[in-house]
């Protein structure tokens, strides 16, 4: 059985960590919904891919911190987000909540929302619910990233512009090299990045893919 005492202890540790974590504190100060906003900000500062007029879609956008950054960086563009969870509205962003990207009806809604726009940037910071087994969780996240990749590389549900960008989160593991090879077939540049906002003990990495090959 699940221990209530253990659960309360874990919650206390989480609250204590959040109260002193540099990026969690900064997120509250800047009204971002999560500390992950600073991961996107840092990656964008490095590669400068979010332009004022960019069309951006964020797959797995809950709680919305990346969309908040996109709206700020792309004031004359278009920002769209999709997530299985309910996502509270963000001024300037078009959000599809309670939506599974593998559902054909959701894919149709995405196309309708984009209204024939070509997409400059596809983002994915989503993650599966952890099983407790690192190898399994790694493979499940790679498959999620691959499913997003297929949306624009195979299925054409999203029309990524030539030279477009795909940025996705992975957890490091055995399938990373193979997935990077797949991405490299369709992008001229694939970089692995670990922003300073990632926790030191985390296996979290980001794959930044630029210059999509039509």
Curated annotation (Swiss-Prot):
Catalytic residue positions: 169
Instruction: Look up the transit peptide and give its residue range.
Output: 1-18
The record's subcellular location field reads: Mitochondrion
Its domain of life reads Eukaryota
Q: Which GO terms describe its molecular function?
A: rRNA (uridine-2'-O-)-methyltransferase activity
Q: Which GO terms describe its cellular component?
A: mitochondrion
Q: Catalyses which reaction?
A: a uridine in rRNA + S-adenosyl-L-methionine = a 2'-O-methyluridine in rRNA + S-adenosyl-L-homocysteine + H(+)
Q: Does the keyword rRNA processing apply?
A: yes
Which family does the UniProt entry place this protein in? Answer: Belongs to the class I-like SAM-binding methyltransferase superfamily. RNA methyltransferase RlmE family.
Recorded hits in HAMAP family, A to Z, give:
RNA_methyltr_E (MF_01547)
**UniProt-listed PANTHER family:** RIBOSOMAL RNA METHYLTRANSFERASE (PTHR10920), RRNA METHYLTRANSFERASE 2, MITOCHONDRIAL (PTHR10920:SF18)
Q: What is this protein called?
A: rRNA methyltransferase 2, mitochondrial
Q: Which organism is it from?
A: Caenorhabditis elegans
